[in-house]
């Protein structure tokens, strides 16, 4: 076989090998391209799924917050309703307590003819005050105390040698508070004469 024939045969073999390699490379590139497309598609699906999860998570958080707000508002409404009902009840009860107070003031406990009435009214009043105290109703009786504009309403002022200046010398009508909140101020007469509180304290200590 001549050299030219051998060379021609080698060229054919080389071309065949290159053709097979090119075909395999093309097939591999095609597979890689499809794989990349599939990866991108899966990544997009994953991103969409994560976005939906975040959206649902936000919805759950918002729903939980709304439920919590509704419960809080409902609790506040119930509390306000209870306070309003209790305050209304206490205000309706004040005239009854005032009438008992006036009955005691107008009855002589030393008089045998009215002693039983006095004791009966006094016992009823104490029982009623004890009962309403369980619901936070407290009587304000500031006799002899310093005048407090937050709890007392001054009807007038009078000179007094017995009481220091700005001291409650007479309680015209007792006040009441509900759970430390003023229901009605005590109606009082205030001293405008006599020794000051400080002077009175010094005199007592002396």
Curated annotation (Swiss-Prot):
This is Protein GrpE. Residues 1-20 are annotated as: Disordered. InterPro entries: GrpE, GrpE_coiled_coil, GrpE_head. It comes from Shewanella oneidensis (strain ATCC 700550 / JCM 31522 / CIP 106686 / LMG 19005 / NCIMB 14063 / MR-1). GO terms for cellular component: cytosol. Gene3D superfamilies: 3.90.20.20, Head domain of nucleotide exchange factor GrpE (2.30.22.10). One of its GO terms (molecular function) is protein homodimerization activity. Participates actively in the response to hyperosmotic and heat shock by preventing the aggregation of stress-denatured proteins, in association with DnaK and GrpE. It is the nucleotide exchange factor for DnaK and may function as a thermosensor. Unfolded proteins bind initially to DnaJ; upon interaction with the DnaJ-bound protein, DnaK hydrolyzes its bound ATP, resulting in the formation of a stable complex. GrpE releases ADP from DnaK; ATP binding to DnaK triggers the release of the substrate protein, thus completing the reaction cycle. GO terms for biological process: protein folding. Belongs to the GrpE family. It comes from the Bacteria. It holds the Pfam family GrpE. Keywords: Chaperone, Cytoplasm, Stress response. It is found in: Cytoplasm. The gene is grpE. Transmembrane segments: none annotated. Homodimer. The keyword Acyltransferase does not apply. Residues 1-17 have a biased composition (Basic and acidic residues).
